[in-house]
From Swiss-Prot:
Its cofactor is Mg(2+). This is Phenylalanine--tRNA ligase beta subunit, chloroplastic. GO terms for biological process: phenylalanyl-tRNA aminoacylation. It catalyses: tRNA(Phe) + L-phenylalanine + ATP = L-phenylalanyl-tRNA(Phe) + AMP + diphosphate + H(+). GO terms for molecular function: ATP binding; magnesium ion binding; phenylalanine-tRNA ligase activity; RNA binding. Its EC number is 6.1.1.20. One of its GO terms (cellular component) is phenylalanine-tRNA ligase complex. It comes from Gracilaria tenuistipitata var. liui (Red alga). It is an enzyme of class 6 (ligase). The gene is pheT. Its main location: plastid. PROSITE patterns: B5, FDX_ACB.
Length: 697
């Protein structure tokens, strides 16, 4: 819809408002401004405004002026543009129309069909409409200004005698438009003369001509739903039906009709007759109740001044600018809002009112962050902490040289056919048959794709959701419950990881090198862990589904300091060890929960002992099932508080004795307040003798 800036300035106060500011504000408020052109001869700007389907009230000059008045908090220049005028009308003999909401008729006699005044000619020319005469120009002017339909008929062609308003009536009739026998349209008649089928066409035989000196002015508002239904039945759309569907607000009808009669009577030097009309009752005024807290929580804090919410006074003022009728209940801290008639099509829910408040106040004046509910503050705070931890994990892995991968959560098949996989019934595609239970499987597929492209070395990680069934749930025949988890997984393969010297050939990544990278990642993340050897992944609650993917001789379970399983690290089952591939996978939630940030407040400061220490190196031959941790715990079980440290300095295995291995331990003894005496040394030697005898072959 095109608009004239000069015309708008005569309706709403736009002094000291630049046109560029007007365009920006309208665009931010949801009304896109396009096709701006300047008419230098008349010092005017013509621009096109597009709006949404639920804001038909904007598609006329008064409607846009009313919206600009709310946006800029400027007054409309005449009360006529705010409120409907009160006209003394007589009732027409029309009852229960299905097509009409309003109908007004007035007879005008002794009319002179003069040329339109220059100001009217200019306004029409702004819309590329050629001015002809008053009878043609004024209905077009009224439609552009108010969005209301006005029709003018030659009174003498309707009746040669004075108009009797009781003869106006509505009748349902078929065969009116293009021979439609099964479709009845409501037709406005005067006695036996058909004036027009409501909303579709006009009787050409009663139109005005050059000899017209007595006219019938008719204004009407159609039921848009009726017009839409008839258009669908007829499969036909006419120029008049389109205008009726795009008609402006019903509340502006009387103002538009009064102005059209006034202009025709004034410039045509005519005598006006009495006003007759038919008006359906308006729907009950819509009332919405909105809590003040709801408005503040949804909109959030404002940028201007201190970071506070909109006050009750500010909200009240904004609602009044929108021509709403607000009432604030201080006891309930809520607003009771009466919605004006011309906004009842698009203001239906409380959220619509809140959006209007934000639009008028300015979306850019609010802080761009999620609203905080006092009940959920703690959860939102925890979510932010979790997100920050995930960001740090990504950062640390990138620093170690790993690239992030993204895969979707489906398999086209599961290579190991494990019972704990979740199968999709009736999948949309073949490659969406299973939900993934591990990130590592997709990373191995990524590696295979890279190998086919000639990329031997790949170091990637992925963070995503996995879906699996607990192995314990398989014992039941009832419906199995699926579970969703957030995991972190990585894959490392590097054939040129290091070389001892420049003259040596490159060496591939070893198990210990890969383990060192994982340890460095955990150290930087500040997660204390314990590495545990595992012989069968059925013992694992988290990673039992990787049993066929990893080499059990090169696989370790990673636990936190409470010995809870949080991750796994191992070597893939490759046929060749030339370029070994290693993977790790963590339960991300448990990994983050295991982070123990270093805090100097929690540190215990002790001075170094100035007394000499005693060192004992021992060599033990133990069974393969006996771990180093168990041996250390056995030494500490002697409850000797002089033990300062226990370190492994050697490890070897005799191939002739497969069931045992040898380990060298260095135990350091020291007292913090004295020098060790003979009694201390004798106790230490006795404990070592007992230990050697215990692990003696």
């Amino acid at each position: 819809m095109k608009f004239s800036l000069r015309w708008l300035q005569q309706i709403v106060d736009l002094n000291n408002i630049k046109f560029s500011t007007l365009v920006d504000k309208l665009s931010v408020s949801g009304f896109e401004v396009e096709d701006i052109s300047r008419n230098s001869s008349n010092d005017d700007m013509i621009f096109d405004v597009t709006t949404t389907a639920n804001r038909q009230d904007i598609l006329c000059t008064v409607g846009l002026a009313r919206e600009i008045s709310s946006i800029f908090n400027r007054d409309l220049k005449y009360k006529l543009y705010k409120d409907s005028i009160a006209i003394s009308t007589h009732c027409l003999n029309i009852l229960n129309s299905v097509s009409l909401l309003d109908l007004s008729i007035v007879n005008v006699n002794y009319f002179y069909n003069n040329r339109s005044p220059l100001w009217l000619q200019y306004y029409l020319s702004s819309y590329n409409i050629k001015s002809l005469n008053l009878l043609t120009d004024i209905p077009q002017y009224i439609y552009l200004k108010w969005g209301q339909s006005i029709e003018i008929f030659d009174k003498n062609k309707i009746s040669s005698v004075p108009i009797q308003y009781s003869l106006f009536n509505l009748q349902k009739k078929s065969h009116i438009i293009y021979d439609s026998p099964n479709i009845e349209l409501e037709v406005l008649r005067y006695d036996d003369v058909i004036l027009f089928p409501i909303g579709f066409s006009l009787n050409e035989n009663i139109k005005c001509d050059a000899a017209t000196n007595s006219i019938v002015i008719m204004g009407y508002v159609c039921d848009k739903q009726y017009i839409t239904d008839i258009k669908k039945k007829l499969k036909l759309s006419t120029y008049l039906s389109q205008r009726c569907c795009n008609q402006g607000s019903r509340s502006d009808f009387l103002n538009a009709f009064y102005e059209s009669v006034y202009l025709l009577g004034s410039f045509g030097f005519a005598t006006l007759g009495k006003f007759y009309g038919y008006h359906k009752l308006y729907n009950i005024s819509r009332i919405l109740f909105i809590d003040k807290v709801k408005i503040q929580n949804i909109l959030g804090s404002v940028k201007i001044g201190s970071y506070n919410y909109l006050t009750v006074k500010e909200i009240f003022t904004l609602l009044e600018r929108l021509n709403f009728l607000p009432i604030y209940d201080s006891l309930k801290s809520s607003f009771k809002i009466h919605i004006p008639v011309y906004r009842q099509d698009d203001i239906v829910r409380p959220i619509d009112v809140i959006e209007e408040v934000a639009r008028i106040y300015g979306f850019d004046n609010f802080i761009s962050k999620l609203p905080l509910n006092p009940i959920d503050n703690k959860n939102i705070f925890l979510n932010n902490i979790f997100a920050n931890k995930v960001y740090r994990i990504r950062y640390l892995l990138r620093c170690l040289g790993l690239h992030e991968a993204q895969n979707y959560s489906f398999y086209d098949y599961y290579p190991f056919n494990h019972d704990t996989q979740i199968k999709i019934y009736n999948p949309l595609a073949q490659d969406q048959s299973f939900l993934r239970s591990s990130l590592a499987v997709h990373l191995t597929l990524n590696q295979q794709d890279n190998l086919r492209q000639g990329n031997k070395d790949i170091e990637v990680f992925e963070i995503g959701k996995v879906f699996r069934l607990y192995s314990s749930s398989l014992e039941y025949d009832n419906t199995l419950n699926s579970f969703e988890f957030l995991h972190l997984s990585g894959l490392i393969a590097n054939s040129i990881f290091l070389r001892p010297s420049w003259s040596d050939k490159e060496q591939s990544l070893s198990w210990f090198h890969a383990k060192g990278m994982v340890e460095e990642f955990l150290d930087r993340l500040e997660v204390p862990v314990v590495w545990k050897k595992i012989s069968d992944l059925d013992q694992s609650n988290l990673f039992f589904n990787l049993m066929h993917l990893l080499n059990m001789n090169w696989t370790a379970i990673i636990c936190n300091r409470f010995h809870e399983e949080i991750g796994i690290f191992g070597k893939l089952c490759n046929k060749s060890d030339f370029n070994s591939t290693y993977v790790f996978e963590f339960d991300l939630v448990k990994l983050i929960a295991s982070i123990e940030s270093l805090n100097h407040i929690n540190s215990i400061i002790n001075p170094y002992s100035s007394y000499p220490s005693l060192t004992r190196d021992i060599s033990l031959t133990v069974k393969n099932s006996c771990t180093i941790s168990f041996i250390k715990a056995r030494i500490l079980s002697y409850e000797n508080n002089l033990i300062e440290s226990i370190e492994v300095f050697n490890y070897y295995k005799d191939k002739s004795i497969n069931a045992f291995y040898n380990v060298g331990l260095r135990i350091v003894y020291r007292a913090h307040n004295r020098t060790l005496n003979y009694s201390d040394i004798n106790r230490i030697d006795q404990e070592i003798d007992d230990l050697l005898n215990e692990y003696k072959l």
